[in-house]
Amino acid sequence: MIGLEHYLTVAATLFVIGIFGLFLNRKNVIVLLMSIELMLLAVNINLVAFSSFLGDLVGQVFTLFVLTVAAAEAAIGLAILVCFFRNRGTIDVEDVNVMKG
């Protein structure tokens, strides 16, 4: 049977991969967004694992809310990137600093 330790190990591994994605790739904004989504997925796995371990549904309900917010964040972030790419022709992190606003 798969225990709580296995889920926590998988979640910790995903979180570390997301952290490495943030720190090692500073050029591409899409990879940064994907790394943040990977970290949120690791948090959701932790919430569901502890919720199942404790026999409480609050963690699973909270995970649904986190997934909803993460989907909205990804959609808005990608929409901003598409508009930025149309205006500037690039999505490098260094060029995002020159945005007006």
Swiss-Prot record:
<keyword id="KW-0830">Ubiquinone</keyword>
<feature type="transmembrane region" description="Helical">
    <location>
        <begin position="65"/>
        <end position="85"/>
    </location>
</feature>
<dbReference type="InterPro" id="IPR039428">
    <property type="entry name" value="NUOK/Mnh_C1-like"/>
</dbReference>
<dbReference type="GO" id="GO:0048038">
    <property type="term" value="F:quinone binding"/>
</dbReference>
<comment type="function">
    <text>NDH-1 shuttles electrons from NADH, via FMN and iron-sulfur (Fe-S) centers, to quinones in the respiratory chain. The immediate electron acceptor for the enzyme in this species is believed to be ubiquinone. Couples the redox reaction to proton translocation (for every two electrons transferred, four hydrogen ions are translocated across the cytoplasmic membrane), and thus conserves the redox energy in a proton gradient.</text>
</comment>
<dbReference type="GO" id="GO:0030964">
    <property type="term" value="C:NADH dehydrogenase complex"/>
</dbReference>
<keyword id="KW-0997">Cell inner membrane</keyword>
<keyword id="KW-0874">Quinone</keyword>
<keyword id="KW-0812">Transmembrane</keyword>
<dbReference type="InterPro" id="IPR001133">
    <property type="entry name" value="NADH_UbQ_OxRdtase_chain4L/K"/>
</dbReference>
<dbReference type="GO" id="GO:0042773">
    <property type="term" value="P:ATP synthesis coupled electron transport"/>
</dbReference>
<keyword id="KW-1278">Translocase</keyword>
<protein>
    <recommendedName>
        <fullName>NADH-quinone oxidoreductase subunit K</fullName>
        <ecNumber>7.1.1.-</ecNumber>
    </recommendedName>
</protein>
<keyword id="KW-1003">Cell membrane</keyword>
<keyword id="KW-1133">Transmembrane helix</keyword>
<keyword id="KW-0472">Membrane</keyword>
<dbReference type="Pfam" id="PF00420">
    <property type="entry name" value="Oxidored_q2"/>
</dbReference>
<dbReference type="GO" id="GO:0005886">
    <property type="term" value="C:plasma membrane"/>
</dbReference>
<comment type="subunit">
    <text>NDH-1 is composed of 14 different subunits. Subunits NuoA, H, J, K, L, M, N constitute the membrane sector of the complex.</text>
</comment>
<comment type="similarity">
    <text>Belongs to the complex I subunit 4L family.</text>
</comment>
<feature type="transmembrane region" description="Helical">
    <location>
        <begin position="4"/>
        <end position="24"/>
    </location>
</feature>
<feature type="transmembrane region" description="Helical">
    <location>
        <begin position="30"/>
        <end position="50"/>
    </location>
</feature>
<dbReference type="GO" id="GO:0050136">
    <property type="term" value="F:NADH:ubiquinone reductase (non-electrogenic) activity"/>
</dbReference>
<keyword id="KW-0520">NAD</keyword>
<keyword id="KW-0813">Transport</keyword>
